[in-house]
Structures are given as C-alpha cells and as structure tokens.
C-alpha cells in the first residue's frame, strides 16, 4: 500500500523541480535566439554578396547585352533608312533642277552642244540630270554632316517655306544669267555674285555654308572647264577659260540652295550611332 506521506512529499518537490527547470529552459532559449541573431547578422553580407553575384551573373549578362544590341541594331537600321530616303529626295531635286535650268540655258543659246556630240551617246545631254542629281545628293548630305561635325547646328530659318523661297531665288538668279544683257560680262558677273551672296545671307548665314558654297563653286567650275575643254559642250561668248565668268556664282547659289534642302530633310532624323 503506497504511503501517503511519500506522495505528498514528492508532489511539491516535483513541482519545484519543474518550476526550477523551466527558467533554465527559457534561459537556454534566449541564448539560442541570441546565437541565431548573431549568425543571421554575420550571414547578411554574404547573402548580399550572393545576391550581387546573382545580379552580375554572366548568365544574365548576355541577356542584357542582347537587349542593348537589339536596340542599337534597330537604331542603325532607322538611321540608314532615313539616309536612303534623304538621298533619293535630294537626287530627285537635283534632276528636276538640272532639267529646268539646262532647258533654260539651251533656249537662251547660252549652252551649245556640237553636232558630233549630239550624234553620240551624249544626245540631248541625258547625262547632265543624273550627274546633277548625284551632286545634289552628295552636297545635301554633306551640309548637315559638316554642321554636326563642327557642333554648330543650323537653326536660321528652318522651315520649308524658307527653303522654297530659296529655291525660287536660285532659279531667278539662273534665269537672270541667261536673260539679262549687260554692257560687258564683268558687270553681269558682279551682279550675279552680289545676288548669290545675298541668297546666302538671307537663307543661310553660316560659316560652314559659306565655306562649302565656295568649295562647291570652285570644284564644279573646274569640272565644267574640263568638260568644255574636251568638247563635250561649249558656252557662247566664253570670257573665262572656255566658260562664262558668272558660272561660279550659279554653282555657289546652287550649293547653298541644295544645302538648305538637305538641312531641312535632316531635321528630326536620329543621330548616327557611335560604336565604342
């Protein structure tokens, strides 16, 4: 038979031991939690480093590079597309101006084509419009390119109405060269030179435009002299090395006019991408 006093004695002792062991367990839990906090604080930088390594993982690098490459490729394609469009427009403008102005010169008997030339492949001077169209495309693309290279974007009268007025003045200068009669060619040349400089001052006023206009006038005059010297065609009453002395003025004003057209076409066109 169990003894009652033993049961009563063991009961409080057991409860006491339980109450004494519970604070020990709680103390151990606090120590464990403190250790976990220390471990977590120590492993934080390593986790950040791991995330950083993941962000710079070479596997992700090609993906971002591929996206950038696609954007650059589309930008290049867009730039080339605009370049082709501008070239075609400038070529067409050069062909039309050549047809109109050459017809005007021929009607006024300023330009004469010998019979032996007309009887050959140069019949009706079919080569003049394509050559003028090609020259117009080159000049029209060169003007905005020089502006971009010099870091001086042309902002003077950048609207199509001004460009069309410039074209009208250029045609008027060419018409005056064929129709006006002066006492001598020097007066005519000085008058056309003043009109050409007035065209540049009215519609351009840029140093690059003036320099390119003078360069174009010199090169075009030299090429024309070579063609006339080889008998491809000739001018009536030549007064300056087989040609007319006012011809450089026509080339100068034509370069300024085509340059303004090229600048206007270049507005809103994305810049050429630069490869590092």
Curated annotation (Swiss-Prot):
Q: Which GO terms describe its cellular component?
A: endoplasmic reticulum; SREBP-SCAP-Insig complex
According to its UniProt entry, this protein's organism is: Bos taurus
Q: Where is the composition biased (Basic residues)?
A: 16-25
Protein name per its UniProtKB record = Insulin-induced gene 1 protein
| Residue numbers on the Cytoplasmic membrane side | 1-83, 144-158, 204-208, 263-276
Site (Required for the recognition of 25-hydroxycholesterol): which residue positions? 170
Query: Subunit structure, per the record?
Result: Interacts with SCAP; interaction is direct and only takes place in the presence of sterols; it prevents interaction between SCAP and the coat protein complex II (COPII). Associates with the SCAP-SREBP complex (composed of SCAP and SREBF1/SREBP1 or SREBF2/SREBP2); association is mediated via its interaction with SCAP and only takes place in the presence of sterols. Interaction with SCAP is mutually exclusive with PAQR3.
Modified sites of kind Phosphoserine: 206
User: Where found?
Assistant: Endoplasmic reticulum membrane
